[in-house]
Amino acid sequence: MSTDQYRRVVVITGLSGAGKSTILRALEDAGYETVDNPPLPLVHDLVARGEGPLAFAVDARSRGFTADGLALAMERMRQLPGVRADLVFVRADTAALLSRYTETRHRHPLASGVGVRDGIRAEEILTASLVDVADLVVDTTDLPVTRLRAMIAERYGPEETGQGMVVSLISFAYPKGLPREADLVLDARFLRNPHYDPTLKPRTGQDRDVAAYIEADPDYATFHDRIDALLRLLLPRFVQEGKKYATIAIGCTGGRHRSVHLVEKLGEELRAQGWSVLRTHRELGISDDAPQAGAARVSTDDRNGRPEEHGSAQAPDELSRTTS
């Protein structure tokens, strides 16, 4: 259905500090009229009387907020003629939320008279039932702002400028944890490691000499070819299932050499096949600002992390001091 046949309405809810304001700003940049924290009883009327795409952030701050009340409001909005309403639930783990509140010294809306941790727990309980009814659940624990904004723009931006499904490629270090948003995780730790070559150790997988060293592994070509075959099978099927975003994470020990090279290599090849690609090197603190589009794809049948030593990725958090 084209954008002139329905009105987009996006309601953002979830945990305070998880990134609702970042998503709201991304939607505003995509042409939505946005309202932050309206009283829940007024949301239906605002949609019924409004024109054009609308986005709301509704959470524990909103007067009259309950999980059941928001679920009922979503049902009523979806019954309005010509309206397509989505519920987006944003969350992050407790450690990430505590870190963001400590950094900004903002007050948690449910922490009156108790600690921030207790406020976070109370909000998790208050909103838990909404996770199951949300159209999109986003965990921003390790998600950089650039990737969060690109994800939202690709899913909810104007269809005439959309690029179809975005393939997100992430390199990471296993000791620092798996990317939570990954649909598929690949392990490159068996490949020869440039870390043990004194001339290559300080470089990264973006370096030609490092790439040549890795590709000289006797099993590299087989590994690469099987990944390519797997993605040629999976990605078109993801599109058939209606996915707008597919995240593939490739890990190694340090997240600097082998995984970085494979993300760079696969990114180039996927763009050549016509996919829209977003690359993130979590441990290097590097991320594309927007998906890099490839050439028109030949149709198939049916058609954040937190780096420690190399710069920091901005937290996708309405509490962040900087703007994205």
From Swiss-Prot:
Keywords recorded for this protein, A-Z: ATP-binding, GTP-binding, Nucleotide-binding
Listed transmembrane segments: none
Composition-biased stretches (Basic and acidic residues): 299-311
Keyword field contains Endoplasmic reticulum: no
InterPro entries to which the protein is assigned, alphabetical: P-loop_NTPase, RapZ-like, RapZ-like_N, RapZ_C
Annotated GTP binding sites: 59-62
Binding locations of ATP: 14-21
MF terms (GO), sorted A to Z: ATP binding; GTP binding
SUPFAM superfamilies assigned: P-loop containing nucleoside triphosphate hydrolases (SSF52540)
Region Disordered, annotated ranges: 286-324
PANTHER family: RNASE ADAPTER PROTEIN RAPZ
NCBIfam families: PRK05416.1
Function summary: Displays ATPase and GTPase activities.
Similarity comment: Belongs to the RapZ-like family.
Protein name, as recorded: Nucleotide-binding protein GbCGDNIH1_0395
Taxonomy of the source species: Bacteria, Pseudomonadati, Pseudomonadota, Alphaproteobacteria, Acetobacterales
